[in-house]
């Protein structure tokens, strides 16, 4: 008997015919109508994802104390956030590895929310509590009290605007608003994990269940489909987004993990800041890069990466067949000296080397709003 936790939408997923799999300690839908159909719906119209397994951790207290605390354990500049802005960040351990990659929501100088990965929110909470200042800051893990769904795709804005009967254009990319729905205030954030425009919507559990069912029905004429983890994975790999446990872990720094763009110099030092800033300036022996196959084959995790002479230069961290590009693509940790856009490499699939190239440019243009 599975001991995996179930999201509040578990029975709804079963009713919709979802295939369920264990993921990060949760029993989650991997697909409904099919991964490719769900992927294409999100790229061309819209997809609805259950992400209520994610963590919500609230940080409240004295403004100065909160800011000093958050700045000391992250590599991006929390100080640069304005109210109702969201930031992609990494919570670091003392060796410069990642406890988790997170999004930080600033409600006010006295209140922040950290959205963390499902498998990590307990570790994040423990890490925060371990390094909490003596006074002035409170950490409250509310992960099991919140419901979260993600509406993603080029028609997401039209669908949700008409559903709520209000203009949502004022919510810019990586911003959020508190909006009334069914007598409750919900968090509507213009963020996502697909490379498309869309929203991540936080609410109470009863409202979340109602919102999922009503939104799914309302969006049908627009081509909205419920989507599982399978499509979520193909979409995020096409968008070159990392996944904890694959491109990110507690050993690799943000520079090695390919998210060096979030590493900032700050007024005060943070965990391993000297090491990480040195790496950003001087480079690292290996780092995450993306690749595309130039012949038939589907790459997966932990396949050997070879140079054109057949020498091993790295390992794949994620791989899939891209429904949009109709070829195998992926991410890999590769020796930095070998990284060059268009550089021929080989991915060893079932002991057979398959031709590929390193791809520094985006796989897909996407429809993310940068306003």
Swiss-Prot record:
Catalytic activity, as annotated: N(6)-[(R)-S(8)-aminomethyldihydrolipoyl]-L-lysyl-[protein] + (6S)-5,6,7,8-tetrahydrofolate = N(6)-[(R)-dihydrolipoyl]-L-lysyl-[protein] + (6R)-5,10-methylene-5,6,7,8-tetrahydrofolate + NH4(+)
Q: Which domain of life is it from?
A: Bacteria
GO MF term set? aminomethyltransferase activity; transaminase activity
**Which UniProt keywords are present, listed alphabetically?**
Aminotransferase, Transferase
Q: Which GO terms describe its biological process?
A: glycine decarboxylation via glycine cleavage system
EC number(s) recorded for this UniProt protein = 2.1.2.10
* A GO cellular component annotation in the UniProt record: glycine cleavage complex
InterPro entries listed in its UniProt record: GCS_T (IPR006223), GCS_T_bac (IPR022903), GCST_C (IPR013977), GCV_T_N (IPR006222), GcvT/YgfZ/DmdA (IPR028896), GcvT/YgfZ_C (IPR029043), TrmE/GcvT_dom1 (IPR027266)
Note the Pfam families from the entry: GCV_T, GCV_T_C
Q: How is this protein organized at the quaternary level?
A: The glycine cleavage system is composed of four proteins: P, T, L and H.
Query: What does this gene product do?
Result: The glycine cleavage system catalyzes the degradation of glycine.
The UniProt entry, under NCBIfam families, shows:
gcvT, PRK00389.1
This protein is called what? Aminomethyltransferase
Origin organism of this chain?
Leptospira interrogans serogroup Icterohaemorrhagiae serovar Lai (strain 56601)
Q: Identify the coding gene.
A: gcvT
């Amino acid at each position: 008997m599975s001991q995996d936790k179930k999201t509040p939408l578990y029975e709804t997923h079963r009713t919709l015919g979802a295939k369920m799999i264990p993921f990060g300690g949760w029993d989650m839908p991997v697909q409904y109508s099919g991964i490719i159909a769900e992927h294409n719906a999100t790229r061309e119209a819209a997809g609805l994802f259950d992400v209520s397994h994610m963590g919500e951790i609230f940080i409240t207290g004295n403004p100065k104390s909160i800011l000093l605390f958050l700045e000391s354990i992250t590599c991006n500049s929390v100080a640069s956030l304005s109210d109702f802005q969201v930031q992609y960040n990494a919570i670091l351990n003392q060796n410069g590895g990642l406890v988790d990659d997170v999004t930080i929501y600033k409600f006010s100088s006295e209140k922040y929310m950290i959205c963390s990965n499902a498998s990590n929110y307990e570790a994040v909470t423990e890490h925060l509590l371990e390094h909490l200042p003596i006074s002035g800051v409170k950490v409250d893990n509310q992960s099991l009290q919140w419901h979260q769904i993600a509406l993603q795709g080029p028609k997401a804005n039209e669908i949700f605007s008409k559903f709520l009967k209000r203009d949502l254009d004022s919510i810019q990319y990586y911003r959020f608003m508190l909006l009334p729905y069914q007598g409750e205030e919900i968090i509507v954030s213009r963020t996502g994990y697909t490379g498309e425009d869309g929203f991540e919507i936080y609410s109470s559990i009863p409202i979340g269940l109602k919102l999922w069912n009503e939104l799914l029905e309302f969006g049908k004429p627009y081509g909205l489909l419920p989507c599982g983890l399978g499509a979520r994975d193909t979409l995020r790999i096409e968008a070159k987004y990392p996944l904890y446990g694959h491109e990110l872990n507690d050993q690799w720094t943000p520079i090695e993990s390919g998210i060096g763009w979030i590493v900032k110099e700050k007024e005060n030092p943070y965990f391993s800041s000297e090491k990480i800033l040195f790496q950003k300036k001087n480079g690292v022996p290996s780092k995450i890069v993306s690749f595309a196959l130039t012949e038939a084959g589907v790459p997966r995790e932990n396949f050997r990466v070879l140079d054109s002479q057949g020498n091993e230069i790295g390992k794949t961290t994620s791989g899939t067949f891209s429904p949009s590009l109709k070829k195998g693509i992926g991410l890999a940790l590769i020796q930095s000296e070998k990284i060059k856009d268009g550089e021929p490499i080989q991915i060893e699939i079932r002991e057979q080397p398959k031709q590929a190239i390193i791809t520094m440019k985006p796989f897909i243009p996407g429809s993310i709003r940068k306003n």
